[in-house]
Amino acid sequence: MAFAIDDKFVSIQFCEGGYDYSILGADYKLIDGGVYDNPDITIHAALNDILEDMGVSEQTERVPVDYEELMEKADTVEQAEIEANHVVSDFKAKTNEMFNDIEGQSPEDVEQTVHAHIMAKLEEYDIPVEIVDVVVSGSRCRGLEQEGSDLDVVVEYKGRESEDDLFNAFNEDGLMIGGVKVDINPITEGKTGTLATYLPGVESYLAEKQAMQKAPAVEVIPDTGGKY
């Protein structure tokens, strides 16, 4: 059985050794779950104990929902999350292969430095956002940079703060890594998108740029009107 309780969903069913339960957010993402290993009590008593651990009182309304439908939605969201993680991990793996280290610093080193920088800025300005991930992007992530190219880094976050405001906060000090200027670009799902939706566009753009760099130069012969 399953219930909608406040802004969450709770499902519970019999399993070997007790009761299997899941706590899902309003977006159907798994928050918590496991096995309640006391088969000697009823499923309703087990549910009450789980809800009590969540801080939910017995007086809180429990709206029954279809268990199978809830689990299907949760599985769909989980699969989408797995695919999104693959997009990001594959992009980072390619960057690791093609990135020209900056004074010995790898893409991972750069991402860690930028993460520490933005966390310090969030604390400085008391900005309540959650950082999802930090990814080296731009020409340097594919070894296509020119002399003087910035080091582009994209940061996905969750929160109400605007992308423009975070951009200003993250870049106001002019972060430099190995003498290279870092350009930090915050994105969020409600505007520019997630990393999973944003990075494929970056990949396509850089592939076109690489193809243009490899294309042979075409010699233009001026029109002399037949006179030599």
What annotation goes with each model-predicted range?
Residues 36-55:
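A short, charged, amphipathic alpha-helix used as a generic interaction element across diverse proteins
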Residues 10-11, 31, 182-184:
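Short, isolated positions in well-ordered beta-strands
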Residues 1-20:
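Short N-terminal "domain-start" leader segments
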Residues 58, 81-149, 156-225:
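Catalytic core of pol beta-like nucleotidyltransferases
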Residues 1-6, 32, 56-70:
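Negatively charged, low-complexity tracts enriched in Asp/Glu with abundant Ser/Thr
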